[in-house]
Curated annotation (Swiss-Prot):
PANTHER family: FRUCTOSE-1,6-BISPHOSPHATASE-RELATED (PTHR11556), SEDOHEPTULOSE-1,7-BISPHOSPHATASE, CHLOROPLASTIC (PTHR11556:SF35)
Listed GO MF terms: fructose 1,6-bisphosphate 1-phosphatase activity; magnesium ion binding
GO cellular component term, pick one: cytosol
Organism, scientific name: Pseudomonas putida (strain ATCC 47054 / DSM 6125 / CFBP 8728 / NCIMB 11950 / KT2440)
Protein's name according to its UniProt entry: Fructose-1,6-bisphosphatase class 1
Gene that this polypeptide is encoded by: fbp
UniProt-listed Enzyme Commission number(s): 3.1.3.11
Amino acid sequence: MSRVTLSRYLIEQTRSNNTPADLRFLIEVVARACKEISHHVSKGALGGVLGSMGTENVQGEVQKKLDVISNDILLEANEWGGHLAGMASEEMDNAYQIPGRYPKGAYLLVFDPLDGSSNIDVNVSVGTIFSVLRCPNQYLSQNESLNEEAFLQPGTEQVAAGYAIYGPQTMLILTLGNGVKGFTLDRELGSFVLTHENIRVPETTAEFAINMSNQRHWEAPVQRYVGELLAGETGPLKKNYNMRWIASMVADVHRILTRGGLFMYPRDAREPSKPGKLRLMYEANPMSFIIEQAGGASTNGYDRILDIKPESLHQRVSVILGSKEEVERVTAYHKE
């Protein structure tokens, strides 16, 4: 049986599920950009791409060279194709306007160009996270200037989401709203090839991912839940659990997606005015869409992530996602 490339898969989706051709082309362009980013990541010190730029992004985070390189690759790959009305990125303060010399399309692309980049200098897996939204009609005119409001849509409005993980293999995980597929980059062929047909989050779990160094700052429901996990067989859950923490959302969530468990980056008491660390638009929403399409669940402790109406482009949110039963347990603790 011949192997199914990403291009073939998307063409078949157009035929069988009426996936719009413009969306298909957009996903292919994003995938090509991810291949280029993968190349730069794999070169590391040989390509002179390690280290920081000496600048900060809108989040107040030090920008790595690869943050900027990856952001530029995604912008340059996608701006000219005629599929997008605009883009937004973790690395840019404001929405990116499609240059007037190019046609505007019907979609918006939101991305974290290099998630986990603080790990790049120590050769830990990093990735690219992206989300696709429809552009509101009032911004579709070639002469209409795009602003932040166009992007402020709840996660339920996503038409596609995915991430590329740059590890021992480069993989692309993708959902178009009808399940989750996994593609592995065949470097000899130069294409992403379908290798994981129907990814599902395992229902039972013995693993969780959280940064335990922040424990003293957590809210009581998270303290309670993690305490029960750590109590193991002698605790109320009557089961031993292992903790894994990579500090790269793509890597941690990829493990949860394939092996089950719970990923938690909850709000804490250090900055009470901030509802969390992770960004809603280009981290929590696409990852939550993927996890839900794979049979899992995602919450901020009180509400479903995908139901949250964004108030700003770089809004932060508490994130708890993974195996459905565990998410429901943590949510119940928050509501008691």
